Amino acid sequence: MEKEDAGAVQCGTGEGEAVVLNERSEQCSAFASIAGCDEAVAQCFLAENDWDMERAINSFFEPGVESALQNKAAADIADPLKQETMSGTASDSCIDLTGDDLVVTKSEATTSNSSTVKQEDESHFSFLTWNIDGLDESNVAERARGVCSYLALYSPDVVFLQEVIPPYYEYLKKRAVSYTIITGNEDEYFTAMMLKKSRVKLISQEIVPYPSTVMMRNLLVANVNISGNSICLMTSHLESTKDHSKERLKQLDIVLKKMMDAPPLATVIFGGDTNLRDQEVAKIGGMPNNILDVWDFLGKPEHCRYTWDTKVNKNLRAPYICRLRFDRIFFRASQEGSQVIPQSLYLAGTEKLDCGRFPSDHWGLLCDFAIIL
């Protein structure tokens, strides 16, 4: 990955720890040179194999789930989605991704948000939503490894994913053993939630259908407890393309009603690929009074205005420039008790992989929430 300049290594407090971290950084460089991969990917394989170089190399080249990813043809999945990308109208064995021995080999963590790589803090939790573009079969295995590298780097407590395909799901189950993963479906393509086992207790889950979707879309809901707080999590991938605006707004209405109907003592967080254009939100009169768009709430930060940006992200090789805020996070506060408040918002996935492409045609949104008693 290449967005920032120097490599940054997470420093320990003693000389011995510093030596170990330096040795591991050198191992990452050596592994990356041998395997022809990113150093962040190298770190993942070394960590899962107890920093044994030979075992890690063997694991990297082991056939298995990645072969399924490589061989999966997405051409027969969701024709409307393929039209969106072309029309110009749209816009390894297990690894614990929350391990304490994370070596940060790029400086994105310190440049974009120094709080993203940290020990668990009960007064905060982190959240990532990302359309990972599983329908694009090009470089899908390397892009999947890239997504897992970001999960290892940021170690978010909650992850929402859109455009997950079955081989990608199997890959995540194999790699992200520190998360409970639930999905909105298990066929063709779907949404998923990843809940860090050490922080998030899953209470219940629900799939809310969209009656008139033609793209297999739905709303995935999970009621969880984080640090003693009841939180209702929701993710969705709303209907794609400009031509399906009417259906998209129907789906948005279902989402907003579901958020408003959640128990009053619960905090509600929705995140996903909404495919919304600003004029569509204006058309319905804006957001309900008790539901906030986190980007608006945080002062409309320019650095994360666009999450689908063909000016910078050339994955689609689009012959046009289109910069839109498709990916959004909505928030409804609880009416009593401790409050969960959005604190910061950053883009994820903005570094190219060695294949010359980004992990997805979308940027991810990484949000930090404070828990105020």
UniProtKB/Swiss-Prot annotation:
Pfam family, one: Exo_endo_phos
Chain residues that bind Mg(2+): D133, E163
Region: Interaction with 5' end of substrate DNA, residue numbers: 131-135, 237-242, 275-277
GO molecular function: 5'-tyrosyl-DNA phosphodiesterase activity; magnesium ion binding; manganese ion binding; nuclease activity; single-stranded DNA binding
This protein's GO CC annotations: PML body
Cofactor(s) this protein requires: Mg(2+); Mn(2+)
Cofactor binding, per record: Binds 1 magnesium or manganese ion per subunit.
Active site: D273 (proton donor/acceptor)
Site (Interaction with 5' end of substrate DNA): Y189, W308, F326, H362
Keywords: DNA damage, DNA repair, Hydrolase, Magnesium, Metal-binding, Nuclease, Nucleus, Receptor
One of the GO BP terms on file: double-strand break repair
Enzyme class: hydrolase
PANTHER family given in the database record: TRAF AND TNF RECEPTOR-ASSOCIATED PROTEIN (PTHR15822), TYROSYL-DNA PHOSPHODIESTERASE 2 (PTHR15822:SF4)
General function of this protein: DNA repair enzyme that can remove a variety of covalent adducts from DNA through hydrolysis of a 5'-phosphodiester bond, giving rise to DNA with a free 5' phosphate. Catalyzes the hydrolysis of dead-end complexes between DNA and the topoisomerase 2 (top2) active site tyrosine residue. Hydrolyzes 5'-phosphoglycolates on protruding 5' ends on DNA double-strand breaks (DSBs) due to DNA damage by radiation and free radicals.
Entry's family note: Belongs to the CCR4/nocturin family. TTRAP/TDP2 subfamily.
Protein name from the UniProt record: Tyrosyl-DNA phosphodiesterase 2
Originating gene: tdp2
